[in-house]
Amino acid sequence: MTESELWSALVPELSVTDLEASLNFYRTVGFQVRFVRTSPPFAYLTLGDAQIMLEQAHSEGWVVAPLERPFGRGINLQIEVDNVQSTRAALTSLGLQVFREPSDSWYQVSGAYEEGQRELLVQDPDGYLLRFVQPLGRRSIER
């Protein structure tokens, strides 16, 4: 594997309040741990081509304002999965409520086509909004 295959060009790093609780959540929805560090508590996770970093909040962290729940207000992270219903079932096993049940959405990508995805939205233990998507393909826009 080459270095460019190891690291995505953009990898979000999320401050979390309890790394172990976050790891339990992210593993349950399908992420794998690439590596961990203990000081400060940190983990690098992958799911298919998606990558994310988690770091337990600490006094030396890069925090520009007080962290208040829900964390990450104003953003959602889209993560492609093979099957949204499988992800939904994994969330049920944790007893978590979803933010939005699976539904199909179509987005215009050109003047003639739109691409669809089945979407499931859920908040992680710190409130970050995650949008798990299953691609549905492309279709012509009817006029």
Spans of features found by a protein language model:
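Alpha-helical macromolecular-interaction surfaces
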Residues: 20-21, 86
